[in-house]
Amino acid sequence: MLVTVEFTYILILFFISLGLSIILFFLGYFLMFKVAYEDKLMGYECGFDPFGNARGEFDIRFYLVAILFLIFDLEITFLFPFSVSIMSMTLFSYSIMLIFLIILTIGFIYEIKKGALDWS
């Protein structure tokens, strides 16, 4: 019985926040100014006039480099706790981290072999 009462409060809070979100969404939608002009639809390039079509296509290699950056940035996120607690680690912890680094190294070698980082 006690658990049900606690979940009831959470459920009430959820529905209140959901209702408030829906009300604010429709209130903003109906009260906004709907005037579109050319300057508003134009792409923004750091305060300069665009050098052509700002909504043009990008080469897929830019997305690939961005994804690779995210993967290796996430690797650093996983390696940081390892480096902070290196003095209190066990052999099991070292083996898990070694497996993690081996998998990342294999992935990096695969990327190089497939030419993912070759821009020529």
Swiss-Prot record:
Which Gene3D superfamilies does the UniProt entry name for this protein? NADH:ubiquinone/plastoquinone oxidoreductase, chain 3
Keywords recorded for this protein, A-Z: Electron transport, Membrane, Mitochondrion, NAD, Respiratory chain, Translocase, Transmembrane, Transmembrane helix, Transport, Ubiquinone
Gene Ontology cellular-component annotations: mitochondrial membrane; NADH dehydrogenase complex
Q: How does it sit in the membrane?
A: Multi-pass membrane protein
Q: Which domain of life is it from?
A: Eukaryota
Does Membrane count among this protein's keywords? Answer: yes
The terms under GO molecular function for this entry are: NADH dehydrogenase (ubiquinone) activity
Q: Where are the transmembrane segments?
A: 10-30, 62-82, 89-109
E.C. number(s) listed in UniProt: 7.1.1.2
Give the location in the cell: Mitochondrion membrane
Which catalysed reactions does the entry list for this protein? Answer: a ubiquinone + NADH + 5 H(+)(in) = a ubiquinol + NAD(+) + 4 H(+)(out)
- Keyword Cell inner membrane among UniProt keywords: no
Family note: Belongs to the complex I subunit 3 family.
Described purpose of this protein according to its UniProt entry: Core subunit of the mitochondrial membrane respiratory chain NADH dehydrogenase (Complex I) that is believed to belong to the minimal assembly required for catalysis. Complex I functions in the transfer of electrons from NADH to the respiratory chain. The immediate electron acceptor for the enzyme is believed to be ubiquinone.
Give the protein name, as stated in the record: NADH-ubiquinone oxidoreductase chain 3
Organism in which the protein naturally occurs: Dictyostelium citrinum
